[in-house]
C-alpha cells in the first residue's frame, strides 16, 4: 500500500472537466490526484512559414506552472526573461505527442496551439498535460469542422500518458511528487489508443534498472494508459 492508500498498479483519482473556459475552442481541467492542469486549445488560420503553401496544418504546445503551483512560490519565467530547459523539454513532448493524434495533411493550413498551465503540482504534470490536452484538441477539431468544413476528418486517435517508477524492486504506476522524488527509476510513457508508443523518457535516478524491470514498468504503463484512454472516451461521450 502506498502513502495515498493506492495499490502499486492503481492510478490516482482522474477527472476531466471539459469546456472549462469560455473563449478557447477547447478547454479541459484535468486532475491526476492533486495535480491539476488547465489545458486550452486555440485555433488560428495559417501555419508556420516553413509550412506555407503545403496544404498541411500544425499543432504545437506551450507549458508553464503558476507561481504557487508548488510548496514554495516560483518566479514566473516571463519575469526571468527566459524559459527553463525543463519547460522547453516538456512543451516539446506535449507537442510531439498531440501531433501523433492528427493527420496534419487533412487539417488544412490551420494551427492549433495547446496551452498547458499547471495550477497545482503533485507529480506527473507532463503526463497529465498530454492526457488532458488530447481532449481539448478533440474539442478544437470539432470547432474547426463546424466553421471551416474540412474535407476529411483529420483525427487518427487518442493519446494518453502516465508515469511509472521502480522502487526497491517494485514497479509503481502514476507517481505523485513524493514517490517521484524517492524512486530509484522513473519513466514517462506516451501511447496511442492502438497501443503504440510515442515517447519513452526514462532515468535511473538512484541505481540502474534491468531489462526485466523495464518490462515490468512498461507493462504497468500500458495498463494505466488503456484505463486513461477509456476515461477520455467517457469524458468525450464516445
From Swiss-Prot:
Belongs to the RNase PH family. This is Ribonuclease PH. GO terms for molecular function: 3'-5'-RNA exonuclease activity; tRNA binding; tRNA nucleotidyltransferase activity. Keywords: Nucleotidyltransferase, RNA-binding, rRNA processing, Transferase, tRNA processing, tRNA-binding. GO terms for biological process: rRNA catabolic process; rRNA processing; tRNA processing. CDD domains: RNase_PH_bact. It comes from the Bacteria. The gene is rph. It holds the Pfam family RNase_PH.
Amino acid at each position: 500500500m502506498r502513502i495515498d492508500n493506492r495499490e502499486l498498479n492503481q492510478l490516482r483519482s482522474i477527472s476531466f472537466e471539459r469546456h472549462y473556459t469560455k473563449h478557447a475552442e477547447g478547454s479541459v481541467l484535468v486532475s491526476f490526484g492533486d495535480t491539476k492542469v488547465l489545458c486550452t486549445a486555440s485555433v488560428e488560420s495559417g501555419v508556420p512559414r516553413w509550412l506555407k503553401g503545403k496544404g498541411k496544418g500544425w499543432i504545437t504546445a506551450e507549458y508553464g506552472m503558476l507561481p504557487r503551483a508548488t510548496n514554495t512560490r516560483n518566479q514566473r519565467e516571463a519575469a526571468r526573461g527566459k524559459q527553463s530547459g525543463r519547460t522547453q523539454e516538456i512543451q516539446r513532448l506535449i507537442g510531439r505527442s498531440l501531433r501523433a493524434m492528427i493527420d496534419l495533411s487533412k487539417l488544412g493550413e490551420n494551427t492549433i496551439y495547446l496551452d498547458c498551465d499547471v495550477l497545482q503540482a503533485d507529480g506527473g504534470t507532463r503526463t497529465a498535460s498530454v492526457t488532458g490536452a488530447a481532449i481539448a484538441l478533440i474539442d478544437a477539431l470539432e470547432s474547426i469542422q463546424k466553421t471551416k468544413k474540412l474535407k476529411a476528418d483529420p483525427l487518427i486517435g487518442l493519446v494518453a500518458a502516465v508515469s511509472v517508477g521502480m522502487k526497491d524492486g517494485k514497479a509503481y504506476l502514476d507517481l505523485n511528487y513524493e514517490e517521484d522524488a524517492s524512486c530509484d527509476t522513473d519513466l514517462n510513457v506516451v501511447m496511442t489508443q492502438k497501443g503504440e508508443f510515442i515517447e519513452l523518457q526514462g532515468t535511473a535516478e538512484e541505481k540502474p534498472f534491468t531489462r526485466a524491470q523495464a518490462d515490468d514498468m512498461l507493462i504497468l504503463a500500458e495498463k494505466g494508459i488503456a484505463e486513461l484512454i477509456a476515461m477520455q472516451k467517457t469524458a468525450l461521450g464516445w
